[in-house]
Design a protein with these regions (language model features):
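Positively charged n-region of N-terminal signal peptides that target proteins for export
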Residues: 1-4
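OB-fold/S1-family single-stranded nucleic acid-binding modules
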Residues: 135-167
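N-terminal post-signal-peptidase region of extra-cytosolic proteins
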Residues: 79-83, 106-118
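OB/S1-fold single-stranded nucleic-acid-binding modules
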Residues: 6, 19-72, 166-168
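Structural detector for short beta-strands of small beta-barrel domains
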Residues: 71-91
Length: 168
C-alpha cells in the first residue's frame, strides 16, 4: 500500500516540476522584451547616456537623499526658491524648492477649480513642510521632481492632493 501511494505521489510531482521548469526556460516576459526594445531605441540610448552623465547622477543622488521621507510619508522641511518652473517644462503648476541643500521641482499637475490659490500666495524664501508619496526624474529636468501631496505653511495645511477617482 505504501509503495502505491509513493508511486502515485511521485507520478504527480515529477510532471509538475517539468511544467514549472519549462515555464522558466521559455524566457522573458513581454514586458522585459518591450523594455529591451525601448533601451535599444534612440530614446532609450539617450536616457542611458543621461543616467551615466554627471547631471543624471546628481538627480539620482537628490532622489536618494529624500527617499526615506518619501517612503515613510513624513514631513520634509523646504524653502521656496522660485515660483516658476524651468523654461519649457510641461509639468503643470509647480515651484522650485530647496530641501536639505538640494533643489527640487515641486510639481502639482494641472489645476482644476482654483485648487492652487493658496499655493500661488507663496513667496520666495517661504518655509513649507512637504509630504509626498512620489519622486521621479526625467532627462529634460536637472532636478528631481517631487509630487506635492500635502503642503503646510506655518502649521496650516494649504494644499492637499485629492486622490484620483477609480483607484489610482
Amino acid at each position: 500500500m505504501k509503495k502505491i501511494v509513493f508511486a502515485l505521489t511521485l507520478s504527480l510531482i515529477i510532471p509538475r516540476g517539468l511544467v514549472f521548469a519549462n515555464n522558466e526556460i521559455k524566457g522573458e516576459t513581454p514586458a522585459k522584451t518591450a523594455r529591451k526594445a525601448w533601451e535599444a531605441s534612440p530614446e532609450g540610448i539617450a536616457f542611458k547616456k543621461w543616467e551615466a552623465s554627471a547631471a543624471g547622477k546628481k538627480v539620482y543622488a537628490g532622489e536618494a537623499k529624500i527617499r526615506k521621507s518619501i517612503r515613510e510619508f513624513s514631513n520634509m522641511n523646504a524653502v521656496v526658491t522660485s515660483l516658476m518652473l524651468p523654461q519649457g517644462s510641461r509639468l503643470g503648476y509647480g515651484i522650485m524648492v530647496n530641501i536639505n541643500g538640494d533643489d527640487y521641482v515641486l510639481a502639482f499637475g494641472v489645476e482644476s477649480k482654483h485648487e492652487f490659490d493658496q499655493l500661488r500666495k507663496l513667496k520666495v524664501n517661504d518655509k513649507i513642510m512637504i509630504k509626498s508619496h512620489n519622486v521621479s526624474h526625467a532627462p529634460k529636468y536637472a532636478f528631481p521632481i517631487v509630487a506635492g501631496d500635502n503642503i503646510e505653511r506655518n502649521g496650516k495645511l494649504i494644499y492637499k492632493r485629492v486622490p484620483g477617482k477609480g483607484g489610482c
